[in-house]
């Protein structure tokens, strides 16, 4: 496996067409929000971004309300992306989150988990999807979560959050971007 090149300004998604549309890839140290309707391809895009990041040698953590480890591996294999070796080598750590606990609005615990993964050596953290958290959490706590993410990004962590469009009002979207 390759070692991460931390001198690069962006991380390739592993797909030249996607990279071109994103200005070369994912900017390192950035906070990215993938927002779209159900079945718009948000998870597929984030999985493609994960693959490119892993291929570039980065260490990733993936918090998911959408998959188990097994279903994630199966879904990615269906996209011709095999991450099993990365999981076994702990270059990709996957944390399934129960939707029921997410609905309690526990964004503080999620932020603590992201912070912990940074301390464990992750370069990039993906959260797919924030939707169950955001739907049951006051706007002020959602803003606080994104402010915490921005602080972690200022320390060099790259964070990619996925959310369904219906979960975020345009007013809240303006506050978090």
Report residues per predicted region:
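Charged, amphipathic alpha-helical linker segments immediately N-terminal to NTP-binding catalytic cores
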Residues: 1-8
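Conserved phosphate/pyrophosphate-binding and hydrolysis machinery centered on Walker-type P-loop NTPases
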Residues: 8, 12, 40-43, 62-66, ...
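Pre-Walker A adenine-sensing motif
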Residues: 13-25
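Hydrophobic helix-cap positions at the C-terminus of alpha-helices
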Residues: 25, 52-53, 117, 152
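Conserved P-loop
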Residues: 32, 37-100
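A short, flexible beta-alpha/helix-coil linker loop
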Residues: 99-102, 131-133
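P-loop NTPase motor core
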Residues: 107-177
């Amino acid at each position: 496996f390759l070692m991460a090149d931390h001198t690069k300004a962006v991380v390739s998604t592993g797909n030249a067409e996607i990279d071109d549309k994103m200005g070369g890839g994912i900017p390192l140290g950035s906070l990215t929000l993938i927002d779209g309707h159900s079945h718009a391809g948000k998870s597929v895009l984030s999985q493609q971004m994960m693959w490119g990041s892993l291929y570039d040698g980065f260490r990733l953590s993936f918090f998911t309300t959408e998959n188990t480890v097994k279903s994630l591996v199966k879904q990615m294999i269906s996209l011709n992306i095999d991450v099993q070796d990365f999981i076994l080598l702990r270059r990709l750590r996957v944390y399934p989150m129960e939707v029921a606990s997410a609905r309690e609005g526990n964004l503080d615990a999620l932020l603590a988990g992201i912070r912990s993964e940074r301390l464990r050596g992750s370069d990039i953290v993906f959260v797919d999807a924030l939707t169950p958290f955001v739907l049951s959490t006051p706007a002020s706590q959602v803003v606080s979560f994104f402010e915490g993410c921005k602080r972690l990004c200022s320390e060099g962590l790259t964070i990619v959050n996925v959310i369904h469009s219906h979960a975020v009002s345009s007013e809240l979207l303006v506050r978090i971007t």
